[in-house]
Amino acid sequence: MEVRHNWTHAQVRELMEMPFMDLLFEAQQVHRQYHPKNYVQVSTLLSIKTGACPEDCKYCPQSARYQTDVEKERLMEVERVLDAAQKAKNAGSTRFCMGAAWKNPKERDMPLLTDMIKGVKDMGLETCMTLGMLTPEQAKQLASAGLDYYNHNLDTSPEYYGNIITTRTYQDRLDTLSHVRDAGMKICSGGIIGMGESANDRAGLLVELANLPTHPESVPINMLVKVKGTPLETAEEVDPFDFIRLIAVARIMMPTSAVRLSAGRENMNEQMQTLCFMAGANSIFYGCKLLTTPNPSEDKDMQLFNKLGINSQQVSQKPDEITENELLDRVVESVAARPTKDDLFYDASL
């Protein structure tokens, strides 16, 4: 499989409609051509500024426009961020991601953000941030501080985007990705499944990502976590097989990228996660919570890895002795209703 940047909707739909086993087989072949087998990269995500976001993303409990249980918090102190990063490293994460609920960062915050980046880098961890839209100059400042990855999701197809967000355009998102790439950073960009979009919209999202001049180094595929108070709290459940298919198609279309299981993994049982790994997912967020929604505990992750013979990629420096199990103690407590296991997939133990 060669790396391509000229995918059409018709070609993607053809992949999506392949027999399930054939699709997973092809995706796993592509995966092994470009990536080590049985290895998964592990990241930890910390909300460094929570709530009161002025945007209207219909899926997000951090929007100031919706009545959710998320309480707003100021930008976290640098020392607390570094403390959380050290705990994440101790628990086995290789990349530390910092997220702020902003439309875009203010200039007054840039020195604090660059201090966070430098401090985390000094620990031997890779760094990632998601701060909203960036100007070219802000992207250069973050890159100069040593930021490895910048996350800015496209969320969905251009055609469906206006049904989800109106406070920034699709082109705004593409422009930020261009600024990030021009500054020399790696891109983390994906989308969310389960917001009422059609199969064509899911194909359209992957076409946009795969036809970028350079594929994102990391492609997070999120399954919507429905949060009370947001406009999407009653969205229809995602069929697990459809989600797994999308993981496989993303792997085939972007063979060199890391495909990450991101938000929604708390609502996937072991069998579903296993098929996602078979389909080519090779990166996860580890333990505790993703910004304001739950994530499987690190113990459960390691138990599953042991069952499957998966090894998480190690940090570049030897982790210190683990003294605490609690990570990300500043993240807002869960506000998402968790579906039951039976609603999500079959139980292989029966």
Swiss-Prot record:
Gene Ontology MF term list: 2 iron, 2 sulfur cluster binding; 4 iron, 4 sulfur cluster binding; biotin synthase activity; iron ion binding
Binding positions for [4Fe-4S] cluster per the UniProt entry: 53, 57, 60
Residue ranges occupied by any Radical SAM core domain in the UniProt entry: 38-256
Catalytic class of the enzyme: transferase
Cofactor note: Binds 1 [4Fe-4S] cluster. The cluster is coordinated with 3 cysteines and an exchangeable S-adenosyl-L-methionine. Binds 1 [2Fe-2S] cluster. The cluster is coordinated with 3 cysteines and 1 arginine.
Cofactor(s) this protein requires: [4Fe-4S] cluster; [2Fe-2S] cluster
UniProt-listed Enzyme Commission number(s): 2.8.1.6
Cystine connections: none
Coiled coil stretches, renumbered: none
Pfam families the UniProt entry points to: BATS, Radical_SAM
Protein origin, superkingdom: Bacteria
Keywords: 2Fe-2S, 4Fe-4S, Biotin biosynthesis, Iron, Iron-sulfur, Metal-binding, S-adenosyl-L-methionine, Transferase
Reactions accelerated catalytically: (4R,5S)-dethiobiotin + (sulfur carrier)-SH + 2 reduced [2Fe-2S]-[ferredoxin] + 2 S-adenosyl-L-methionine = (sulfur carrier)-H + biotin + 2 5'-deoxyadenosine + 2 L-methionine + 2 oxidized [2Fe-2S]-[ferredoxin]
Pathway(s) the chain acts in: Cofactor biosynthesis; biotin biosynthesis; biotin from 7,8-diaminononanoate: step 2/2
UniProt keyword GTP-binding, yes or no: no
Single GO BP term: biotin biosynthetic process
Residues annotated for [2Fe-2S] cluster binding in this entry: 97, 128, 188, 260
Family statement drawn from the similarity comment of this UniProt entry: Belongs to the radical SAM superfamily. Biotin synthase family.
Protein's job: Catalyzes the conversion of dethiobiotin (DTB) to biotin by the insertion of a sulfur atom into dethiobiotin via a radical-based mechanism.
Protein name: Biotin synthase
